[in-house]
């Protein structure tokens, strides 16, 4: 330690705000790595699903044709957005998505999984990871070194997931038929276990993120009354948003509806921040809107596949998904038929 301090004494002093910017960039990079790992694992799963369906060979070719340059651009853009996004707005995005996800799962099938959620939660997952790191490292003496270690670990996991994704896209068909590759044989046996694994991992991630989000928001308030003035309109706004979006999703579950939902969510959050927030929060909301739209655009083919998969499961399991009651005209026709039979 004495030798390190001796050499460090010759280095120029770095201002504190520089280290704050470096820490924000490292947090954003970890959040972007988490989103990319989720994306790669879902891509592997959906690619194998398409290979097993003769009618989806075109989608399999589209998934296989995605270039590494787009993946690098995806990682770089998300890292920049997460580093610029303030922890306050990031915490609000995490809480809003958690409430919406719980509502979607409960209304769908009493806890059933929806494959669309794995892709709709991408930006919220990155916000949650960045927000959790900001809260957990608040006041830490070696904050930058800890974040560098987190970047190294997340980068290693991302590298392995990308390597598996490229391997599956190029050689899975050959190796699964020849049965001599350990990776492809493992995926051939347990590729259906990828969504349950991601589901459990996302539960833990959002549980930690929600706790960190509440703590990050509450640290700006000096009294309970001030916190209540913020949380009361926030709760009302989020509840109304979830109810509205849930009805729209049931009536029109399309790609256009996914983008419309993003604009409605960010618009509601913008109005709320203009009422009880700060001017910096408004800028961060536009950054969040850019990230949400980019994640949906980048996962367009996969979102369409997930939507079709959810619809097929809903049609194949009518008992799990309750059908609507018979229309009024049908009931009136049955009543008229009974009355006619009684008169005869």
UniProtKB/Swiss-Prot annotation:
GO terms for cellular component: membrane. Pfam families: TMEM82 (PF15816). Coiled coil: none annotated. The chain crosses the membrane at residues 29-49, 75-95, 117-137, 139-159, 197-217, 230-246, 257-277, 282-302. Keywords: Membrane, Transmembrane, Transmembrane helix. Residues 317-344 are annotated as: Disordered. It is found in: Membrane. InterPro entries: TMEM82. It is a multi-pass membrane protein. Residues 329-344 have a biased composition (Basic and acidic residues). It comes from the Eukaryota. Belongs to the TMEM82 family. This is Transmembrane protein 82. It comes from Xenopus tropicalis (Western clawed frog).
